[in-house]
Amino acid sequence: MKNHGMNPYLPSWEYVPDGEPHVFGKRVYIYGSHDRFAGYAFCQNDYVCWSAPVDDLTDWQYEGIIYTRAEAAHNEDGRQCLYAPDVTCGPDGRYYLYYALNETSAISVAVCDTPAGKYTYYGDVHYPDGTTLGARPGDEQQFDPGVLTEGKTTWLYSGFCPPLMPGRTGALCYRLTSDMLTVEQTYPAVVPGAQTAKGTGFEGHAFFEASSIRKVGDTYYFIYSSELSHELCYAVSDSPCRGFVYGGTLVDNADLGLCDTARYFTGNNHGSIEQINGRWYVFYHRHTNSSLFCRQGMVEPIEILPDGRIPQVEITTSGPNGAPLPAVELRELPAYAACNLYMTQPPQVNAEAGQNPFPYITQDGADVMPESESKPEAYICNLTPGTVVGFKYLNFQNVTKVSVKTRGMCYYGGFDVLLTADGEPIGTVSAARGNEWTWQTTELAIPDGISAIYFRMKGYGTLSLAAAKFH
Protein backbone atom coordinates (compact mmCIF):
# COMPACT_ATOMS: atom_id res chain seq x y z
CA MET A 1 0.00 0.00 0.00
CA LYS A 2 2.34 2.69 -1.28
CA ASN A 3 2.01 6.31 -0.15
CA HIS A 4 5.03 8.01 -1.81
CA GLY A 5 6.88 7.98 1.51
CA MET A 6 4.79 10.50 3.41
CA ASN A 7 3.91 10.89 7.07
CA PRO A 8 1.79 9.47 8.50
CA TYR A 9 3.37 6.34 7.05
CA LEU A 10 0.18 4.24 7.30
CA PRO A 11 -3.05 5.10 5.44
CA SER A 12 -4.87 8.23 6.56
CA TRP A 13 -7.73 6.18 8.08
CA GLU A 14 -5.43 4.03 10.25
CA TYR A 15 -4.66 4.99 13.84
CA VAL A 16 -1.76 2.94 15.24
CA PRO A 17 0.14 4.99 17.84
CA ASP A 18 2.81 3.89 20.36
CA GLY A 19 4.67 2.19 17.52
CA GLU A 20 7.45 -0.26 18.39
CA PRO A 21 9.37 -1.02 15.17
CA HIS A 22 11.24 -4.33 14.95
CA VAL A 23 13.14 -5.84 12.03
CA PHE A 24 12.59 -9.58 11.73
CA GLY A 25 14.12 -11.06 8.61
CA LYS A 26 13.74 -8.73 5.65
CA ARG A 27 10.73 -6.80 6.96
CA VAL A 28 10.11 -4.19 9.61
CA TYR A 29 7.02 -4.79 11.73
CA ILE A 30 5.08 -2.16 13.66
CA TYR A 31 3.53 -3.16 16.98
CA GLY A 32 1.40 -0.49 18.58
CA SER A 33 -1.87 0.15 20.27
CA HIS A 34 -4.89 0.84 18.07
CA ASP A 35 -7.03 3.94 18.42
CA ARG A 36 -10.55 4.26 17.08
CA PHE A 37 -11.45 7.28 14.97
CA ALA A 38 -13.79 9.52 17.00
CA GLY A 39 -13.25 7.22 19.98
CA TYR A 40 -13.84 8.27 23.57
CA ALA A 41 -10.74 6.63 25.08
CA PHE A 42 -7.22 5.51 24.20
CA CYS A 43 -6.66 2.22 22.36
CA GLN A 44 -10.24 1.04 21.84
CA ASN A 45 -9.47 -1.28 18.91
CA ASP A 46 -7.68 -4.64 18.78
CA TYR A 47 -3.97 -5.03 18.07
CA VAL A 48 -3.13 -5.04 14.37
CA CYS A 49 0.24 -5.34 12.67
CA TRP A 50 1.65 -3.63 9.59
CA SER A 51 4.97 -4.39 7.92
CA ALA A 52 7.17 -3.11 5.12
CA PRO A 53 10.27 -4.34 3.26
CA VAL A 54 13.39 -3.03 4.94
CA ASP A 55 14.41 -1.38 1.67
CA ASP A 56 11.10 0.41 1.05
CA LEU A 57 9.32 2.25 3.86
CA THR A 58 6.74 3.53 1.38
CA ASP A 59 5.18 0.08 0.88
CA TRP A 60 3.26 -0.92 4.02
CA GLN A 61 1.30 -4.16 4.14
CA TYR A 62 -1.57 -4.90 6.51
CA GLU A 63 -0.84 -8.17 8.32
CA GLY A 64 -4.19 -8.40 10.10
CA ILE A 65 -5.48 -8.50 13.65
CA ILE A 66 -2.90 -10.26 15.82
CA TYR A 67 -4.60 -10.14 19.25
CA THR A 68 -8.01 -9.04 20.46
CA ARG A 69 -9.40 -7.55 23.64
CA ALA A 70 -11.63 -10.61 23.97
CA GLU A 71 -8.58 -12.89 24.09
CA ALA A 72 -6.80 -10.91 26.80
CA ALA A 73 -6.68 -12.32 30.32
CA HIS A 74 -8.22 -10.19 33.10
CA ASN A 75 -10.69 -8.80 30.56
CA GLU A 76 -13.61 -11.20 30.70
CA ASP A 77 -16.19 -8.48 30.12
CA GLY A 78 -14.15 -6.90 27.31
CA ARG A 79 -14.32 -3.51 28.97
CA GLN A 80 -10.59 -2.85 29.23
CA CYS A 81 -8.41 -1.65 26.37
CA LEU A 82 -5.14 -3.05 25.09
CA TYR A 83 -2.49 -0.45 25.86
CA ALA A 84 0.92 -0.02 24.20
CA PRO A 85 2.71 -3.37 23.62
CA ASP A 86 6.16 -4.55 22.65
CA VAL A 87 7.41 -7.73 20.96
CA THR A 88 10.63 -9.70 21.22
CA CYS A 89 11.93 -12.91 19.68
CA GLY A 90 12.58 -15.34 22.52
CA PRO A 91 15.42 -17.85 22.90
CA ASP A 92 13.13 -20.55 21.46
CA GLY A 93 12.60 -18.56 18.24
CA ARG A 94 8.99 -17.72 19.02
CA TYR A 95 7.65 -14.18 19.24
CA TYR A 96 6.40 -12.83 22.56
CA LEU A 97 3.99 -9.90 22.81
CA TYR A 98 4.10 -8.05 26.14
CA TYR A 99 1.16 -5.83 26.99
CA ALA A 100 -0.89 -4.23 29.76
CA LEU A 101 -4.58 -3.46 30.06
CA ASN A 102 -5.64 0.03 31.05
CA GLU A 103 -7.07 -0.93 34.46
CA THR A 104 -4.90 -3.91 35.44
CA SER A 105 -1.45 -3.56 37.00
CA ALA A 106 0.07 -6.60 35.32
CA ILE A 107 2.20 -7.36 32.29
CA SER A 108 0.63 -10.14 30.26
CA VAL A 109 2.30 -12.09 27.48
CA ALA A 110 0.98 -13.67 24.28
CA VAL A 111 3.03 -15.85 21.96
CA CYS A 112 3.14 -16.68 18.25
CA ASP A 113 5.36 -18.73 15.93
CA THR A 114 5.63 -15.86 13.43
CA PRO A 115 6.04 -12.09 13.85
CA ALA A 116 2.56 -11.18 12.60
CA GLY A 117 0.40 -14.25 13.09
CA LYS A 118 -2.35 -14.86 15.64
CA TYR A 119 -0.93 -14.48 19.14
CA THR A 120 -2.34 -16.58 21.99
CA TYR A 121 -2.27 -15.81 25.70
CA TYR A 122 0.78 -17.35 27.37
CA GLY A 123 0.74 -16.01 30.93
CA ASP A 124 1.48 -13.07 33.20
CA VAL A 125 4.93 -11.92 34.28
CA HIS A 126 5.35 -13.13 37.86
CA TYR A 127 7.76 -13.54 40.74
CA PRO A 128 9.33 -16.97 41.41
CA ASP A 129 6.61 -17.73 43.98
CA GLY A 130 3.92 -17.21 41.33
CA THR A 131 2.74 -13.79 42.52
CA THR A 132 1.91 -11.55 39.57
CA LEU A 133 4.33 -8.69 39.05
CA GLY A 134 2.46 -5.60 40.17
CA ALA A 135 0.35 -7.40 42.79
CA ARG A 136 2.71 -7.36 45.77
CA PRO A 137 2.28 -4.64 48.39
CA GLY A 138 4.57 -1.79 47.38
CA ASP A 139 4.74 -2.78 43.70
CA GLU A 140 4.40 0.15 41.34
CA GLN A 141 1.92 0.15 38.48
CA GLN A 142 2.90 -2.03 35.53
CA PHE A 143 2.42 -0.10 32.31
CA ASP A 144 3.82 0.31 28.77
CA PRO A 145 6.23 -2.65 28.70
CA GLY A 146 9.44 -2.55 26.69
CA VAL A 147 11.49 -5.72 26.16
CA LEU A 148 14.91 -6.78 24.89
CA THR A 149 16.12 -10.38 24.62
CA GLU A 150 19.83 -11.19 24.77
CA GLY A 151 20.57 -14.89 24.61
CA LYS A 152 18.44 -16.57 27.29
CA THR A 153 17.85 -13.33 29.21
CA THR A 154 15.01 -10.92 28.57
CA TRP A 155 15.03 -7.42 30.03
CA LEU A 156 11.63 -5.97 30.85
CA TYR A 157 11.00 -2.26 31.47
CA SER A 158 7.77 -0.77 32.73
CA GLY A 159 6.32 2.10 34.73
CA PHE A 160 3.96 5.06 34.86
CA CYS A 161 5.04 8.27 36.60
CA PRO A 162 2.69 11.24 36.32
CA PRO A 163 4.62 14.16 37.84
CA LEU A 164 2.19 14.69 40.74
CA MET A 165 1.42 11.05 41.55
CA PRO A 166 3.04 10.01 44.86
CA GLY A 167 5.00 6.81 45.29
CA ARG A 168 6.26 6.51 41.72
CA THR A 169 10.03 6.25 41.41
CA GLY A 170 10.66 6.02 37.67
CA ALA A 171 11.25 3.49 34.90
CA LEU A 172 11.30 -0.01 36.37
CA CYS A 173 13.63 -2.78 35.21
CA TYR A 174 13.38 -6.57 35.60
CA ARG A 175 15.47 -9.49 34.38
CA LEU A 176 13.39 -12.44 33.24
CA THR A 177 14.36 -16.09 32.94
CA SER A 178 14.27 -17.99 29.65
CA ASP A 179 10.59 -18.87 30.20
CA MET A 180 9.88 -15.19 29.37
CA LEU A 181 7.58 -14.86 32.40
CA THR A 182 9.51 -15.33 35.65
CA VAL A 183 11.23 -12.37 37.31
CA GLU A 184 14.79 -13.39 38.12
CA GLN A 185 15.95 -10.02 39.44
CA THR A 186 14.46 -6.59 40.13
CA TYR A 187 16.40 -3.31 39.98
CA PRO A 188 15.99 0.26 41.19
CA ALA A 189 14.48 2.68 38.68
CA VAL A 190 16.82 3.10 35.71
CA VAL A 191 15.45 6.57 34.89
CA PRO A 192 13.90 8.73 37.62
CA GLY A 193 10.39 10.12 37.59
CA ALA A 194 9.72 13.80 38.26
CA GLN A 195 9.55 13.30 42.02
CA THR A 196 13.02 11.76 42.21
CA ALA A 197 14.80 13.58 39.35
CA LYS A 198 15.74 16.77 41.18
CA GLY A 199 19.49 17.34 41.07
CA THR A 200 20.04 14.71 38.38
CA GLY A 201 20.70 15.11 34.68
CA PHE A 202 17.08 14.09 34.07
CA GLU A 203 15.54 17.09 35.83
CA GLY A 204 13.03 18.72 33.48
CA HIS A 205 12.96 15.58 31.30
CA ALA A 206 12.13 12.94 33.89
CA PHE A 207 10.46 9.65 33.03
CA PHE A 208 6.69 9.69 32.52
CA GLU A 209 5.79 6.56 30.50
CA ALA A 210 6.47 4.70 27.21
CA SER A 211 9.45 2.51 28.13
CA SER A 212 11.44 1.18 25.18
CA ILE A 213 14.92 -0.30 24.95
CA ARG A 214 17.45 -0.78 22.15
CA LYS A 215 21.08 -1.87 21.99
CA VAL A 216 23.40 -0.03 19.61
CA GLY A 217 26.80 -1.68 19.52
CA ASP A 218 27.70 -2.08 23.19
CA THR A 219 25.48 0.78 24.36
CA TYR A 220 21.93 0.49 25.67
CA TYR A 221 19.49 3.23 24.67
CA PHE A 222 16.43 3.65 26.86
CA ILE A 223 13.72 5.59 25.02
CA TYR A 224 10.83 7.12 26.94
CA SER A 225 8.20 9.84 27.08
CA SER A 226 9.27 12.56 29.48
CA GLU A 227 7.28 14.51 32.04
CA LEU A 228 6.56 17.01 29.23
CA SER A 229 4.60 14.21 27.53
CA HIS A 230 5.00 15.45 23.94
CA GLU A 231 8.69 14.58 23.56
CA LEU A 232 10.55 11.30 23.25
CA CYS A 233 13.84 11.32 25.12
CA TYR A 234 16.69 8.86 25.44
CA ALA A 235 19.21 7.80 28.05
CA VAL A 236 22.35 5.72 27.55
CA SER A 237 24.34 3.20 29.57
CA ASP A 238 26.79 0.36 29.08
CA SER A 239 24.50 -1.77 31.26
CA PRO A 240 20.83 -2.64 30.69
CA CYS A 241 19.92 -2.27 34.37
CA ARG A 242 21.87 0.65 35.83
CA GLY A 243 23.95 3.73 35.12
CA PHE A 244 21.74 5.45 32.56
CA VAL A 245 22.67 9.05 31.72
CA TYR A 246 20.29 11.52 30.09
CA GLY A 247 21.02 11.91 26.38
CA GLY A 248 18.50 14.40 25.04
CA THR A 249 15.29 14.73 23.05
CA LEU A 250 14.86 12.54 19.98
CA VAL A 251 11.68 14.12 18.62
CA ASP A 252 8.87 16.35 19.84
CA ASN A 253 5.47 16.08 18.16
CA ALA A 254 5.16 19.88 18.10
CA ASP A 255 8.85 20.61 17.29
CA LEU A 256 9.31 22.26 20.68
CA GLY A 257 12.99 22.31 21.47
CA LEU A 258 13.69 23.28 17.87
CA CYS A 259 11.10 26.08 17.73
CA ASP A 260 10.08 28.58 20.38
CA THR A 261 6.39 27.93 19.79
CA ALA A 262 4.49 24.76 18.90
CA ARG A 263 4.26 24.03 15.16
CA TYR A 264 1.59 21.36 15.71
CA PHE A 265 -0.89 20.67 18.49
CA THR A 266 0.82 18.79 21.30
CA GLY A 267 -0.22 15.54 22.91
CA ASN A 268 1.37 12.47 24.43
CA ASN A 269 4.13 10.65 22.58
CA HIS A 270 5.43 7.08 22.43
CA GLY A 271 7.73 5.19 20.10
CA SER A 272 11.28 3.98 19.63
CA ILE A 273 14.26 3.78 17.32
CA GLU A 274 15.25 1.02 14.91
CA GLN A 275 17.99 0.39 12.39
CA ILE A 276 16.38 -0.43 9.05
CA ASN A 277 18.51 -1.36 6.06
CA GLY A 278 21.55 0.34 7.58
CA ARG A 279 19.80 3.58 8.54
CA TRP A 280 18.37 4.58 11.91
CA TYR A 281 14.83 5.93 12.35
CA VAL A 282 12.67 7.19 15.19
CA PHE A 283 9.01 6.19 15.25
CA TYR A 284 6.55 8.37 17.19
CA HIS A 285 2.97 9.62 16.88
CA ARG A 286 0.84 12.72 16.39
CA HIS A 287 -2.74 13.62 17.36
CA THR A 288 -5.66 14.23 14.99
CA ASN A 289 -9.40 14.97 15.04
CA SER A 290 -8.92 17.51 17.84
CA SER A 291 -8.69 14.55 20.21
CA LEU A 292 -6.25 12.75 22.47
CA PHE A 293 -7.62 9.46 21.17
CA CYS A 294 -6.98 9.59 17.39
CA ARG A 295 -3.23 9.18 17.07
CA GLN A 296 -1.22 8.28 13.98
CA GLY A 297 2.26 6.84 13.54
CA MET A 298 5.07 9.01 12.17
CA VAL A 299 8.71 8.26 11.35
CA GLU A 300 11.88 10.29 10.77
CA PRO A 301 15.48 9.37 9.91
CA ILE A 302 17.90 10.06 12.75
CA GLU A 303 21.67 10.16 13.05
CA ILE A 304 23.63 8.49 15.83
CA LEU A 305 26.83 10.49 16.08
CA PRO A 306 30.23 8.88 16.73
CA ASP A 307 30.01 9.90 20.40
CA GLY A 308 26.59 8.23 20.72
CA ARG A 309 24.50 11.40 20.79
CA ILE A 310 21.33 11.66 18.71
CA PRO A 311 20.39 15.23 17.71
CA GLN A 312 16.69 16.08 17.89
CA VAL A 313 14.98 15.79 14.51
CA GLU A 314 12.12 17.91 13.23
CA ILE A 315 8.76 16.47 12.28
CA THR A 316 8.40 16.26 8.51
CA THR A 317 6.10 15.18 5.73
CA SER A 318 8.84 13.25 3.92
CA GLY A 319 10.19 11.18 6.83
CA PRO A 320 9.46 7.67 5.49
CA ASN A 321 10.96 8.56 2.12
CA GLY A 322 14.27 9.47 3.70
CA ALA A 323 14.61 12.30 1.16
CA PRO A 324 12.53 15.25 -0.10
CA LEU A 325 9.42 14.32 -2.07
CA PRO A 326 9.27 15.13 -5.81
CA ALA A 327 6.64 17.87 -5.88
CA VAL A 328 5.53 17.58 -9.50
CA GLU A 329 5.58 13.77 -9.60
CA LEU A 330 3.13 13.54 -6.72
CA ARG A 331 -0.37 13.05 -8.07
CA GLU A 332 -1.39 15.35 -5.25
CA LEU A 333 -0.08 16.35 -1.85
CA PRO A 334 -2.77 15.41 0.69
CA ALA A 335 -3.46 17.98 3.36
CA TYR A 336 -3.33 15.32 6.08
CA ALA A 337 0.41 14.97 5.33
CA ALA A 338 1.02 18.42 6.81
CA CYS A 339 3.69 18.31 9.48
CA ASN A 340 3.01 21.85 10.69
CA LEU A 341 -0.43 23.16 11.62
CA TYR A 342 -0.74 26.21 13.82
CA MET A 343 -2.38 29.60 14.18
CA THR A 344 -0.92 33.09 14.05
CA GLN A 345 -4.17 34.92 14.86
CA PRO A 346 -6.96 34.41 17.42
CA PRO A 347 -9.22 31.52 16.37
CA GLN A 348 -12.71 31.76 14.92
CA VAL A 349 -15.53 29.23 15.33
CA ASN A 350 -16.49 27.08 12.35
CA ALA A 351 -20.03 25.70 12.10
CA GLU A 352 -18.65 22.58 10.40
CA ALA A 353 -16.62 21.72 13.46
CA GLY A 354 -19.14 22.72 16.13
CA GLN A 355 -17.65 24.86 18.84
CA ASN A 356 -14.01 23.88 18.35
CA PRO A 357 -12.18 26.99 17.12
CA PHE A 358 -8.91 25.27 16.18
CA PRO A 359 -7.86 23.66 12.89
CA TYR A 360 -7.29 19.92 12.89
CA ILE A 361 -6.87 16.88 10.66
CA THR A 362 -10.00 14.74 10.42
CA GLN A 363 -11.87 12.46 8.02
CA ASP A 364 -15.32 12.13 6.46
CA GLY A 365 -16.86 8.92 7.75
CA ALA A 366 -16.58 6.55 10.67
CA ASP A 367 -13.73 4.33 11.85
CA VAL A 368 -12.90 1.59 9.33
CA MET A 369 -10.77 -1.54 9.13
CA PRO A 370 -8.48 -2.25 6.16
CA GLU A 371 -10.90 -4.90 4.93
CA SER A 372 -13.58 -2.26 4.35
CA GLU A 373 -14.36 -1.60 0.70
CA SER A 374 -14.79 2.15 1.08
CA LYS A 375 -12.28 4.33 2.88
CA PRO A 376 -12.91 7.81 4.28
CA GLU A 377 -11.11 10.85 2.92
CA ALA A 378 -8.91 12.86 5.28
CA TYR A 379 -8.53 16.63 5.26
CA ILE A 380 -7.86 19.66 7.46
CA CYS A 381 -10.92 21.53 8.70
CA ASN A 382 -11.48 24.77 10.57
CA LEU A 383 -8.86 26.84 8.77
CA THR A 384 -9.28 30.49 9.69
CA PRO A 385 -7.25 33.56 8.69
CA GLY A 386 -3.69 33.26 9.93
CA THR A 387 -3.70 29.45 10.10
CA VAL A 388 -0.48 27.96 8.70
CA VAL A 389 -0.33 24.55 7.02
CA GLY A 390 3.25 23.41 6.40
CA PHE A 391 4.91 20.55 4.50
CA LYS A 392 8.58 19.54 4.74
CA TYR A 393 10.35 18.78 2.43
CA LEU A 394 9.71 18.82 -1.31
CA ASN A 395 11.92 19.00 -4.38
CA PHE A 396 10.45 21.63 -6.69
CA GLN A 397 11.37 21.55 -10.37
CA ASN A 398 9.73 23.70 -13.07
CA VAL A 399 6.65 24.53 -11.01
CA THR A 400 4.59 27.32 -12.59
CA LYS A 401 1.12 26.60 -11.17
CA VAL A 402 -0.29 25.63 -7.79
CA SER A 403 -3.74 24.14 -7.18
CA VAL A 404 -5.60 23.70 -3.90
CA LYS A 405 -8.68 21.59 -3.20
CA THR A 406 -10.94 23.33 -0.68
CA ARG A 407 -14.46 23.73 0.56
CA GLY A 408 -16.05 26.20 2.95
CA MET A 409 -17.47 29.67 3.21
CA CYS A 410 -14.54 32.02 2.97
CA TYR A 411 -14.76 35.42 1.30
CA TYR A 412 -11.74 36.84 -0.55
CA GLY A 413 -10.16 33.55 0.50
CA GLY A 414 -6.92 31.95 -0.42
CA PHE A 415 -3.46 31.20 0.86
CA ASP A 416 -0.23 33.13 0.98
CA VAL A 417 2.52 30.74 -0.08
CA LEU A 418 5.81 30.84 1.85
CA LEU A 419 9.00 28.82 1.63
CA THR A 420 10.03 29.56 5.22
CA ALA A 421 7.70 29.73 8.18
CA ASP A 422 8.53 33.34 9.01
CA GLY A 423 9.44 34.54 5.55
CA GLU A 424 7.70 36.74 3.03
CA PRO A 425 5.08 35.22 0.69
CA ILE A 426 6.25 34.33 -2.79
CA GLY A 427 2.69 34.64 -4.01
CA THR A 428 -0.95 33.90 -3.27
CA VAL A 429 -3.17 31.05 -4.45
CA SER A 430 -6.93 31.44 -4.66
CA ALA A 431 -9.42 29.11 -2.96
CA ALA A 432 -12.89 28.29 -4.22
CA ARG A 433 -15.93 29.03 -2.07
CA GLY A 434 -18.78 26.53 -1.61
CA ASN A 435 -19.90 23.37 0.16
CA GLU A 436 -18.39 20.94 -2.37
CA TRP A 437 -14.74 20.09 -2.79
CA THR A 438 -13.37 22.22 -5.63
CA TRP A 439 -9.94 22.60 -7.20
CA GLN A 440 -8.69 26.12 -7.88
CA THR A 441 -5.50 26.69 -9.89
CA THR A 442 -3.30 29.79 -9.74
CA GLU A 443 -0.21 30.63 -11.78
CA LEU A 444 2.67 30.77 -9.32
CA ALA A 445 6.32 29.99 -9.99
CA ILE A 446 8.17 28.23 -7.19
CA PRO A 447 11.98 28.40 -7.30
CA ASP A 448 13.70 25.15 -8.22
CA GLY A 449 15.25 23.28 -5.33
CA ILE A 450 14.50 21.55 -2.05
CA SER A 451 12.29 23.51 0.29
CA ALA A 452 9.47 23.43 2.78
CA ILE A 453 6.21 25.00 1.69
CA TYR A 454 3.64 26.76 3.85
CA PHE A 455 0.08 27.81 3.07
CA ARG A 456 -1.10 30.66 5.30
CA MET A 457 -4.82 31.30 5.02
CA LYS A 458 -6.19 34.75 4.30
CA GLY A 459 -9.68 36.17 3.85
CA TYR A 460 -12.81 36.08 6.00
CA GLY A 461 -14.56 32.94 7.21
CA THR A 462 -13.39 29.33 7.33
CA LEU A 463 -12.06 26.73 4.93
CA SER A 464 -11.26 23.04 4.78
CA LEU A 465 -8.23 21.88 2.76
CA ALA A 466 -8.02 18.44 1.15
CA ALA A 467 -4.93 18.63 -1.06
CA ALA A 468 -2.52 20.67 -3.16
CA LYS A 469 -0.96 20.07 -6.57
CA PHE A 470 2.14 21.47 -8.23
CA HIS A 471 2.31 21.79 -12.03
PLM feature spans:
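Carbohydrate-active catalytic/glycan-binding domains of CAZyme proteins
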Residues: 1-471
